[in-house]
């Protein structure tokens, strides 16, 4: 048989199979589904995602078809929630029904078969690891005790910028190093030897864990599974991750003590691993998954938010001047302000909230509907993938005046906060799966940002204007800048 005829036959057989399966699944769907755009055979609405970041494309779909929209992406049924009302119903009223996560190739490979906290299903394992995390690492007492670590690492960062006065410097890189060091010292008792490599792996992994790989969207296809080249790339990344974490854990076993001279979170996990009364055994893979969680949610999100805040301030010089003036007035003479002092400064606090509104750390929050239910009058079938478009909600003109404009002053009139109570602004999620480290993360954003505004005057590289700034985002589960933020620091002279 001619090889071209063989390939045509294979394609026809595969297409026929998918068409049959799609019709079979469609016949089982309830009638009262959310509105949906016209779709194509085999691929459904997959073609609509081309040419843009998912959160941008999905915003356009929900603007046209309604805040709750139903999509068929390949053979996977998804529902997009893009309003505060629908999100509140899913994450508060029906929270247990929507507390699950769906699997992706990226999360399964890099997060140890979702044997972690971020990507874990809503089960006893998740409850156990979250309880340990909150009680042993993220309690209010512990977060306050980490203040001296922030001061140490902030002093190091200030020295780096002072040594580069008048010279363009990659602020993104230096801020990421600082954020990484703070989290490592707080969680693990010391800075990891390979933390730079680990941070790079986090960025790569988050870019491929969004669930939009073809193999994620056609889970029944062995052929697409076989031809998923990113799967092999992820496995190579996983091997590098194992090498780093196995080495770190071996060093940790033989060390005498950590930063505080006592147990850190890894010691606690090892101790509890030996406890026969655990509902779910704590495995070595689970410990490694937790460490990768800490890097994913702890270091990447804080660094990304500081970079976006500085980017928006550099693009809006009048806002930068206002923030610097207020910080310098309130912190005058205070070389090492604590979290409480910084959070009392109104305008920089509004700058952070406005940054999180425009640039949430995770633009799309993935959930899984456990059982059939109703949201804003529409039926959501069991096992439907849910995409909460936090990015779109933060830019909805129904809730925000001039929504695409960076304007921290809006919070003088709008008393919304970011801790999961106001569903118009949920950068850390909401409900029982809200980010447990949000207060730790906010402290790691607000204190460094205030210090950078206090100590330095900032300029763009020579010949560059605010209008020239590239504000593009990187594709993936998180939303960091596509290109690094380059700035020129000058030491602030209070007498000038």
Swiss-Prot record:
Q: Which domain of life is it from?
A: Eukaryota
Q: In which pathway does it act?
A: Secondary metabolite biosynthesis; terpenoid biosynthesis
Use in biotechnology or industry: The monoterpenic phenol thymol is widely used as a fragrance and a flavoring ingredient in food and cosmetic industries. Its derivatives have also several biological and pharmacological properties such as antimicrobial, antioxidant, anticarcinogenesis, anti-inflammatory and antispasmodic activities. Medical applications include the treatment of disorders affecting the respiratory, nervous, and cardiovascular systems. It may also act as a growth enhancer and immunomodulator.
Give the Enzyme Commission number: 1.14.14.-, 1.14.14.51, 1.14.14.53
Q: How does it sit in the membrane?
A: Single-pass type II membrane protein
Q: Which annotated residues bind heme?
A: 435
**Which reactions are catalysed by this chain?**
gamma-terpinene + 2 reduced [NADPH--hemoprotein reductase] + 2 O2 = carvacrol + 2 oxidized [NADPH--hemoprotein reductase] + 3 H2O + 2 H(+); (4S)-limonene + reduced [NADPH--hemoprotein reductase] + O2 = (1S,5R)-carveol + oxidized [NADPH--hemoprotein reductase] + H2O + H(+); (4R)-limonene + reduced [NADPH--hemoprotein reductase] + O2 = (1R,5S)-carveol + oxidized [NADPH--hemoprotein reductase] + H2O + H(+); alpha-terpinene + 2 reduced [NADPH--hemoprotein reductase] + 2 O2 = carvacrol + 2 oxidized [NADPH--hemoprotein reductase] + 3 H2O + 2 H(+)
Molecular function (GO) terms listed?
heme binding; iron ion binding; monooxygenase activity; oxidoreductase activity, acting on paired donors, with incorporation or reduction of molecular oxygen
Mostly located where?
membrane
The reply on keyword Membrane is: yes
Give the residue spans that cross the bilayer.
Answer: 1-21
- Activity's dependence on pH: Optimum pH is 6.8-7.
Q: Where is this region: Disordered?
A: 471-496
Give cofactor(s), names only: heme
Query: What is any Pfam family matched here?
Result: p450
One GO cellular component term of this record is: membrane
InterPro entries documented for this protein: CYP450_71D, Cyt_P450, Cyt_P450_CS, Cyt_P450_E_grp-I, Cyt_P450_sf
Q: Which cysteines are joined by disulfide bonds?
A: none
Task: Alphabetically list the UniProt keywords.
Answer: Heme, Iron, Membrane, Metal-binding, Monooxygenase, Oxidoreductase, Signal-anchor, Transmembrane, Transmembrane helix
Q: Which GO terms describe its biological process?
A: terpenoid biosynthetic process
Subcellular localization, as worded in the UniProt entry: Membrane
What is the recorded function of this protein according to its Swiss-Prot or TrEMBL entry?
Involved in the biosynthesis of phenolic monoterpenes natural products thymol and carvacrol which have a broad range of biological activities acting as antimicrobial compounds, insecticides, antioxidants and pharmaceutical agents. Catalyzes the C2-hydroxylation of gamma-terpinene and alpha-terpinene to produce carvacrol. Also mediates the C6-hydroxylation of (4S)-limonene and (4R)-limonene to form carveol.
The entry assigns this protein to a family as follows: Belongs to the cytochrome P450 family.
What is the name listed in the Swiss-Prot or TrEMBL entry for this protein? Cytochrome P450 71D181
Q: What is the originating organism of this protein? A: Thymus vulgaris
Q: Which gene encodes it?
A: CYP71D181
């Amino acid at each position: 048989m001619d090889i071209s005829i063989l390939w045509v036959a294979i394609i026809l057989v595969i297409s026929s199979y998918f068409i049959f399966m799609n019709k079979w699944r469609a016949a089982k769907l309830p009638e009262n589904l959310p509105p949906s755009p016209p779709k194509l055979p085999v691929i459904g609405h997959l073609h609509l995602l081309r040419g843009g970041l998912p959160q941008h494309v999905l915003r356009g779909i929900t603007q046209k078809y309604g805040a709750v929209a139903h999509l068929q992406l390949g053979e996977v049924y998804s529902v997009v929630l893009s309003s505060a009302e629908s999100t509140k119903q899913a994450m508060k009223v029906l929270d247990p029904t929507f507390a699950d996560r769906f699997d992706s190739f990226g999360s399964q490979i890099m997060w140890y078969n979702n044997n972690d906290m971020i990507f874990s299903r809503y089960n006893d394992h998740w409850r156990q690891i979250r309880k340990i995390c909150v009680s042993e690492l993220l309690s209010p007492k512990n977060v306050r005790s980490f203040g001296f670590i922030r001061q140490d690492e902030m002093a190091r960062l200030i020295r780096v910028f002072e040594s580069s006065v008048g010279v363009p410097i990659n602020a993104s890189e230096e801020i990421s190093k600082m954020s990484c060091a703070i989290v490592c010292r707080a969680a693990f008792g010391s800075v990891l030897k390979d933390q730079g490599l680990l941070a790079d792996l986090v960025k790569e992994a988050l870019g491929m864990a969004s669930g939009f790989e073809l193999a994620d969207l056609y889970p029944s296809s062995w052929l697409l599974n076989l031809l998923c080249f990113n799967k092999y790339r992820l496995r190579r990344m996983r091997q590098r991750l194992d090498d780093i974490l196995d080495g770190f854990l071996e060093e940790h076993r033989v060390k005498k003590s950590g930063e505080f001279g006592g147990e850190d979170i890894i010691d606690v996990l090892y101790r509890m691993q030996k406890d026969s009364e655990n509902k779910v055994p704590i495995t070595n893979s689970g410990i490694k998954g937790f460490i990768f969680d800490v890097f994913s949610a702890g270091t990447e999100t804080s660094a990304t938010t500081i970079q976006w805040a500085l980017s928006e301030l550099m693009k809006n010089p009048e806002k930068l001047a206002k923030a610097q003036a207020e910080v310098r007035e309130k912190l005058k003479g205070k070389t090492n302000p604590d979290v409480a002092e910084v959070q009392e400064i109104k305008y920089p606090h509004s700058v952070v909230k406005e940054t999180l509104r425009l640039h949430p750390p995770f633009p799309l929050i993935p959930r899984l509907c456990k059982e059939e239910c109703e949201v804003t009058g529409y039926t959501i079938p069991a096992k439907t993938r849910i995409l909460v478009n936090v990015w779109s909600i933060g830019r909805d003109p129904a809730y925000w005046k001039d929504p695409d404009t960076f304007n921290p002053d809006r919070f003088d009139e709008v008393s919304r906060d970011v801790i999961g109570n106001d569903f118009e602004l949920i950068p850390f999620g909401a409900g029982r799966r809200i980010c447990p480290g949000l207060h730790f993360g906010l402290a790691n954003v607000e204190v460094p940002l205030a210090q950078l505004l206090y100590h330095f005057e900032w300029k763009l590289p020579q010949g560059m204007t605010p209008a020239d700034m590239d504000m593009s985002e990187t594709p993936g589960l998180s939303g960091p800048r596509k290109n690094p933020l380059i700035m020129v620091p000058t030491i602030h002279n209070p007498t000038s």
